Amino acid sequence: MSKRIQAKHKLDRRMGQNIWGRPKSPVNRREYGPGQHGQRRKGKMSDFGTQLRAKQKLKGYYGNITEKQFRRYYAEAIRLRGDSGENLVGLLERRLDAVVYRAKFVATPFAARQFVNHGHVKVNGVRVNIPSYQVKAGDLIEVKESSRQLEIVIVATQLSERDVPDYIEADHAKMTARVTRIPSLSEVPYPVQMEPNLVIEFYSR
């Protein structure tokens, strides 16, 4: 098991929130952070601390993206026209592993990254094994025919915990999906509040 997967429960406890909306999240049982000092009362957080927390939460949600890669998303978000926070969310939601997760082909962002890495996904008929691949609106995403009967796929498509968002058209009979448009922050079904503008402020310091 990778360190990223081992750390997901720790992130929930550190944030005191169920980041992925999972029934087995440790914060469903306790609301304090990890470690022996997790129950201490916390004082008011500084602006820097608030921005850092927003960054850790958003970065962690997408499978704990590396800092180097997340900085690249920030750089691209401020380069694009429009609201930089909205741009950041759009770039993250266009990741191939994010689309695979949103389409309910697998149950978690961590599983989505591994699923793509192992070559189970095609984009416009071509196998792509890069989780960060940027999907464009209209691209056809499909699970390889030989991978459609994998247990993780069958279980994920039957999950009732979350729905496929409106900006993705998913056909679980054919195991295909399309991103119909780049979503705004308000459209993304985050289980907790995400504050991408605070992330932009963090990197803009």
UniProtKB/Swiss-Prot annotation:
The keyword Ribosomal protein applies. GO terms for molecular function: rRNA binding; structural constituent of ribosome. It holds the Pfam family Ribosomal_S4. Residues 94-155 form the S4 RNA-binding domain. SMART domains: Ribosomal_S4, S4. One of its GO terms (biological process) is translation. InterPro entries: Ribosomal_uS4, Ribosomal_uS4_bac-type, Ribosomal_uS4_CS, Ribosomal_uS4_N, S4_RNA-bd, S4_RNA-bd_sf. Residues 1-49 are annotated as: Disordered. Keywords: Ribonucleoprotein, Ribosomal protein, RNA-binding, rRNA-binding. GO terms for cellular component: small ribosomal subunit. Residues 1-12 have a biased composition (Basic residues). One of the primary rRNA binding proteins, it binds directly to 16S rRNA where it nucleates assembly of the body of the 30S subunit. Belongs to the universal ribosomal protein uS4 family. Part of the 30S ribosomal subunit. Contacts protein S5. The interaction surface between S4 and S5 is involved in control of translational fidelity. This is Small ribosomal subunit protein uS4. It comes from Methylobacterium radiotolerans (strain ATCC 27329 / DSM 1819 / JCM 2831 / NBRC 15690 / NCIMB 10815 / 0-1).
